[in-house]
Amino acid sequence: MINVAEIMKRGAENKKLPPWVNMRHAWMVNDGLRDKDLEYPENVVRIKNLDYKKKLDAERFAAILDSWKMDKQREMLYASSGDASDIDSDSYVSNSLFDLCVPASYMGASDKAYPVIVSVHGGGWFYGDKELYSYYCCHLAQSGFVVVNFNYRLAPQNKYPSAIEDVAYLVKYIDDYARVFGLDMNRFFMLGDSAGAQLTAQYCIAASNQGYRKKLDYFT
């Protein structure tokens, strides 16, 4: 188990930057070493860079599925925008992009209704994005799930409850478009790592409480 002090030594600390930026540097280096030379499963496709705060272009999404039948690429772009913000910048702000990691069988199926897993990434509430958990989510998808891997707003630029709001927005979004995405929301699962585990637990508790559901408009 690598502790925080050991992880910090892996980053190139810059005294001119805030401590949280240096910590982000260190975690990025550590995660890069963790994922070095990992290979993605050959029977899984990533549909990248959908946005859960924008209306889904269902025709564009359908066109992606159709185009896959021609060239069988393992990575399909819904939008070409970048995944991570500039980690050196004080204005580091996460976006609302998400990926679908799907079994290859999903791409050619009609009238599909796949079980779905929402994966909430870790990072101490101030670091990380969907790319850090892409390999992990693709391996989950091998078992026949559609796995949703997404970004959420991070501290310190975004104050509580920004992150948990984004978890709720994401779940509502995939529920709203479940038919388009071919999801069976009766077989819905969530998981999270570290900060993601806390956000997952908080979401599930709040979403199952009628008092919270009446006060907040973003729970499904």
Label each PLM-derived region with a short phrase.
Residues 128-136, 148-187:
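Catalytic nucleophile-loop/oxyanion-hole region of alpha/beta-hydrolase
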Residues 169-220:
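Primarily recognizes the serine-hydrolase "nucleophile elbow" in alpha/beta-hydrolase
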